């Protein structure tokens, strides 16, 4: 039985270190050094939490910028069912879905005669991507400017101010966080739209 004692001591010691001490230490350091990120990168309007900048939301009102399509189960941007459609590029169902999305984008943005940015008609692998490309944001800018009764240049400036660049730059193209952009839009526009942008 003598061999059981060191085994039990080691089990208890490792449990205390890896199960209690290490998680508490890393959590404490995270909240101390990166408080917002450790709390979920929450976005707030006043005292109210309106979402997380890490998870996209399903903006449906035409007065708001829309994000990428979401293929999560049950409802768009469902964080409990993260995942893509898993449709191959050769699958006719994917082509049909993209075609329908292109049609909807052209209907929503009738003044835009150029190609629809690809990220507005294709879902991300997670289904929760909170970002869109600058091209996708600029594509929607005329519609937003018209509905919000703002100069187009002001809307474009909001997009530029919301731009996030990859560091270093060769890691990816600049993107825009849709939730942050819509919150900035609300704060700069005197025309309010019916829906709260915080509602998924």
Curated annotation (Swiss-Prot):
Transmembrane region(s): 6-26
Keywords from the named record: ATP-binding, Cell inner membrane, Cell membrane, Ion transport, Membrane, Nucleotide-binding, Potassium, Potassium transport, Transmembrane, Transmembrane helix, Transport
Membrane topology: Single-pass membrane protein
GO terms of biological process kind: potassium ion transmembrane transport
InterPro entries named in the record: KdpC
Function: Part of the high-affinity ATP-driven potassium transport (or Kdp) system, which catalyzes the hydrolysis of ATP coupled with the electrogenic transport of potassium into the cytoplasm. This subunit acts as a catalytic chaperone that increases the ATP-binding affinity of the ATP-hydrolyzing subunit KdpB by the formation of a transient KdpB/KdpC/ATP ternary complex.
Assembly with partners or alone: The system is composed of three essential subunits: KdpA, KdpB and KdpC.
Name of the featured protein: Potassium-transporting ATPase KdpC subunit
Lineage per the UniProt record: Bacteria, Pseudomonadati, Pseudomonadota, Gammaproteobacteria, Enterobacterales
């Amino acid at each position: 039985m003598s061999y059981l004692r060191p085994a039990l001591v080691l089990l208890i010691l490792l449990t205390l270190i890896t199960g209690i001490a290490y998680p508490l230490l890393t959590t404490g350091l995270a909240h101390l050094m990166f408080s917002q990120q450790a709390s979920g990168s929450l976005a707030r309007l006043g005292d109210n939490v309106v979402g997380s900048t890490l998870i996209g939301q399903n903006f449906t009102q035409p007065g708001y910028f829309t994000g990428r399509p979401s293929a999560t189960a049950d409802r768009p941007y469902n964080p409990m069912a993260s995942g893509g459609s898993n449709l191959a590029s050769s699958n006719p169902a994917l082509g049909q879905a993209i075609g329908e999305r292109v049609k909807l984008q052209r209907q929503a943005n009738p003044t835009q005669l150029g190609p629809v940015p690809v990220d507005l008609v294709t879902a991300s692998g997670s289904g929760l991507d909170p970002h869109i490309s600058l091209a996708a944001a600029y594509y929607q800018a005329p519609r937003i400017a018209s509905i919000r009764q703002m100069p187009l240049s002001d809307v474009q400036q909001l997009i530029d101010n919301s731009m996030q660049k990859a560091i270093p730059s060769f890691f990816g193209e600049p993107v825009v966080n849709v939730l942050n952009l819509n919150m900035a839009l609300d704060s700069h526009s005197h025309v309010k739209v019916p829906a709260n942008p915080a509602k998924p």
